[in-house]
Design a protein with these regions (language model features):
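Beta-propeller folds
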Residues: 1-383, 389-395, 400, 473, ...
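Glycine-rich His-Gly loop
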Residues: 88, 290, 389, 459-464, ...
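Flexible loop/turn segments at secondary-structure boundaries
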Residues: 92-93, 147-148, 194-196, 226-227, ...
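Secondary-structure transition/capping motifs at alpha-helix termini
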Residues: 103-105, 145-147, 157-160, 176-181, ...
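Cap/lid segment of the alpha/beta-hydrolase catalytic domain
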Residues: 115-129, 142, 146, 402-405, ...
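Structured core elements
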Residues: 187, 241, 253-254, 286-287, ...
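Active-site lining segments that contact anionic ligands and/or coordinate catalytic metals
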Residues: 237, 249, 275, 282, ...
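Active-site-proximal cap/loop segments of hydrolase catalytic domains
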Residues: 491-687
Length: 687
């Protein structure tokens, strides 16, 4: 295929360039017809260039489908009165939700058909589903555009007519425990002008069919523009927990779940830099916090007023406590080892006096792997549901009997086709970064090719303390079967090695992320895993920032790069507090009102560091309704790199005009988009 530089005569960039606006800021005007025309032209250029690869994309897509079990049924969950599950038909994008009275499966009925809700909608995302305490009413939120502004609906189960309650709210909704025959209270969040969930509201929902709509009551409004409000309910069903938090500070308030109209109770007042989460068992609260150190410790206090916090699990230097789940019998803790970047589930059984009866770790099937505690609605459950997966092992669900220790396999995602998971091998190597820090790099490949350098897809993220723990991908098998190695650079800024790893890759230390990613690339070559001239870099969202910066600095390091809804115009975005997310991101990137911060961000912001040089082939994806990374960021980057390109490699932009930050909502379109992206990757790798 002949590559075409983006500035050839007649290209969108050449046709729409404005000499009076060389930075392409005019693309930020969503109402302009020229903007729509430019994006349409770029999409057409993308389609024209891609046309010869369409047969390969079709092959990848259908091969991917053949590997999957397209008809999917979730595990059943028995609540107090009914058992619930979802089923997705082999030809369906969306599921149906089913239930039956406990012990009477012959009386099953579909109570919510997502297919009907999504019909004739170009985009559909269900933000949340919440069952009333008696399990006879369903509240849910839905977004039909992709801009993450949700509408609240209600219906009686199983076949009531849906009633729209509210629009323009946050995705989550929570029932209080005050239900009567007449109604119950729902809690939800609303946005300010920058789409920050700044307020918590309660609404009395009358169940009578023609009951008048009540006016929502404000519970809490958060004035600090860096703080977001959220609400949830403890597994004990005793308390509603309200968090108002920034990226590094949390305030926790509470309401008795059966008395949501009472005054808020403060469980932890905000302290700058102190993050907190709270859970509950009868008579006691638990507090996970970093007040005494960056790796968190666990405290407890009596439920009574003015009780003081007492340490239960002390801060450690070699592991970070990442989460706590309370049950009647004790706690499950998520604990991340800094040495091997592995999360362990720790079981802590407590007696009625809160003394430790048992302290042990739940066994892992292999390392590295991901082991997660599935949400269990039963506070007194003596059986836990675990989800486990790795780079070579598809997701499996187990029931762990706490009394006998017996693990029972409940479900495993089936994988069909010629490449079985058993034919894969994963390994971890360590890259030495510019300052001597050892950066973990995970790799998965075909076992029969593990002794030779391979074409490689290198993925990275490195922000917000998010950890890229091992995950299995059926779509990834299309690349692996064709001889590609898939590698993940666990760069600083992520959470793979605990809170210090995150802190070492944010704010003034952000440069470490970029050094780490390039060091990972060098380590893969030095370890004879990767062929130096056949490495594609890939990153999404903040990972797009990582990749965008690295291709500016070392374009020769990669034969191509994939930037999916990439955060590229960092300085300009952070200088505009009217955009969604900006003020909440000050603690991640810094506030550029300070000249030194602006200078620092300008030093790496991808769009501000484009140079006339030979760029690798670029596949850039944006979304029109994206409220996290505005469509114009990838569009401007595409335009300016096209102008700067000194080589022949293509610079391609595709903007999805019917979705948001998460891409397509229907699974078949999402899989087809993945196949197109993979076709580009294989082309770039010469496969």
């Amino acid at each position: 295929m002949k590559a075409q530089p983006g500035m050839h005569e007649g290209s969108p960039v050449a046709r729409y360039y404005r000499a009076d606006d060389p930075e392409w800021h005019w693309l930020e005007n969503r109402e302009s017809a020229d903007v729509s025309d430019f994006l349409t032209a770029a999409n057409q250029q993308h389609a024209d260039w891609f046309a010869p690869l369409s047969p390969l994309a079709d092959t990848l897509y259908h091969s991917h489908l053949a590997r999957r079990e397209l008809a999917v049924k979730s595990l059943e969950t028995a609540l107090d009165h009914f058992t619930f599950w979802s089923e997705t038909g082999a030809e369906d994008d969306y599921p149906c939700w089913w239930r039956y009275p406990n012990g009477q499966p012959e009386q099953k009925s579909c109570f919510f058909d997502v297919r009907e809700r999504a019909a004739e909608q170009p985009f559909y995302d269900m933000g949340d589903m919440a069952l009333s305490p008696d399990e006879q009413w369903l509240a849910w939120t839905e977004d039909t555009q992709g801009d993450e502004r949700f509408t609240l609906w209600l219906k009686a189960l199983p076949n009531g007519t849906p009633r729209q309650l509210l629009s323009d709210i946050g995705p989550s909704v929570c029932w209080a425990e005050d239900q009567t025959a007449d109604g119950a209270t729902l809690l939800f969040t609303r946005f300010d002008d920058t789409q920050r969930p700044d307020s918590l509201w309660r609404l009395w929902v009358a169940f009578a069919e023609h009951a008048p709509m009540q006016t929502p009551t404000l519970v809490l409004r958060e004035a600090d523009p860096e703080f977001w409000v959220g609400v949830g309910k403890t597994r004990s069903k005793a308390w509603l927990i309200i968090e108002s938090g920034s990226k590094d500070t949390t305030e926790v308030l509470a309401l008795p779940a059966d008395q949501p109209e009472t005054p808020l109770v403060c469980l932890h007042a905000r302290e700058p830099g102190v993050e907190v989460s709270i859970d509950h068992r009868p008579g006691v609260f638990y507090r996970l916090h970093n007040q005494t150190g960056p790796h968190f410790q666990l405290d407890m206090r009596a439920e009574s007023d003015n009780a003081s916090w007492q340490p239960l699990i002390a801060h450690r230097d070699d592991a970070t406590l990442e989460g706590v789940d309370a049950f009647e019998w004790g706690l499950i803790l998520a604990e991340r080892s800094h040495q091997d970047a592995q999360v362990l589930l720790r079981r802590l059984e407590l007696d009625s006096h809160h003394q430790t009866l048992l302290d042990s770790y739940i066994e892992l099937p292999e390392t590295p792997c991901s082991q997660l505690l599935e949400d269990s609605p039963h506070f007194n459950a003596r059986t836990l549901h675990l989800r486990e997966e790795s780079f070579t092992r598809p997701p499996s669900w187990y029931a762990l009997d706490l009394d006998s220790g017996v693990r029972t396999l409940l479900k495993q995602v089936p994988v069909h086709g010629s490449l079985a998971p058993e034919q894969l091998v994963s390994r971890r190597i360590w890259a030495t970064s510019h300052d001597g820090e050892q950066v973990p790099v995970s790799v998965v490949m075909r076992a029969d090719l593990a002794d030779q350098p391979l074409p490689t897809l290198l993925y990275g993220y490195g922000a917000y303390g998010e950890a890229l723990d091992p995950w299995f991908s059926i779509a990834r098998l299309e690349l692996l079967e064709r001889g590609v190695a898939f590698a993940v650079a666990h760069v600083r800024g992520g959470g793979e090695r605990g809170e210090p790893w995150y802190l070492a890759g944010k704010m003034a230390h952000k440069e470490n992320s970029f050094h780490d990613f390039l060091a990972a690339r060098e380590a893969l070559v030095a370890a004879h895993i990767s062929q130096p001239e056949r490495i594609v870099a890939c990153g999404a969202s903040a990972g797009g920032l990582l990749v965008g910066t690295c291709i500016n600095r070392a374009p020769e390091a990669f034969c191509a790069a994939v930037l999916d809804v990439p955060f590229l115009d960092v300085l300009r975005t952070m200088q505009n507090p009217e955009l969604p997310l900006t003020t909440a991101e000050y603690t991640e990137w810094g506030n550029p009102e300070a000249p030194d911060v602006a200078e620092r961000i300008a030093g790496y912001s991808p769009i501000d560091n484009i140079r006339s040089q030979r760029y690798p082939a670029l596949w850039i994806e944006g979304s029109w309704f994206d409220t996290r990374v505005s469509y114009w960021e990838p569009a401007k980057f595409y335009a300016r790199v096209s102008q700067a390109q000194q080589g022949a490699a293509p610079i391609l932009l595709h903007t999805d005009m019917s979705s948001g930050h998460g891409g397509a909502s229907g699974r078949f379109k999402a899989w087809r988009d993945t196949a197109r992206q993979d076709a580009f990757i294989l082309w770039a790798l010469g496969l």
